[in-house]
Amino acid sequence: MDNCVAAKIMDSNLSSQQQHFLQPHCFFPQNVQQLSPAEEQQASKAKPIKRQRSASPELMRCKRRLNFNGFGYSLPQQQPAAVARRNERERNRVKLVNLGFATLREHVPNGAANKKMSKVETLRSAVEYIRALQQLLDEHDAVSAAFQSGVLSPTISPNYSHDMNSMAGSPVSSYSSDEGSYDPLSPEEQELLDFTTWF
């Protein structure tokens, strides 16, 4: 006797409410066939077959998928439109973050030349760049304060006005004082001063 006949015999012994809770739909093959009235009578006269319990993993998974619709509880189903809107918002957010990193990459030293900078590398480079700019500002403020207090006095030379005019286009600048000129800038400092060409 096949599973279909056994299922029909067992179904006839239980009420419909008991069947709903005790027998998950995955317990028997999905291709259950309808019995003709003659086959149903023959199956009802046959000896009831006991269901054998198996401890197979497939059976255990099947038992966990019981249908609880009879209790009036069902899991909330998300609407496809709501999911689509949420996914679209997330895509837009990621796009904006990526555009922000691309813009930042263009403003950090070596960022425009290095297209493969990761987000972490871009952030580290930006932090280093900001610290270097802050150090330059602090040094400039210290020199300005020294000029204002009279400790240092700038000497105006014919090259001074030329140096001031060329500062916007050139990353190298020099200051003149009574004691002489400053040491030339290192390549790293020149690279940091190059930011004026980006704006």
Swiss-Prot record:
Q: Which domain of life is it from?
A: Eukaryota
Kindly give the InterPro entries that the UniProt entry links to this protein. bHLH_dom (IPR011598), HLH_DNA-bd_sf (IPR036638), MASH1/Ascl1a-like (IPR015660)
Tissue distribution is: Neuronal precursor cells.
Tagged with keyword Nucleus: yes
**Domain bHLH, which positions?**
81-133
Give the SUPFAM superfamilies listed for this entry: HLH, helix-loop-helix DNA-binding domain (SSF47459)
What is the name of the protein in this document?
Achaete-scute homolog 1
Which species expresses this protein natively?
A: Xenopus laevis
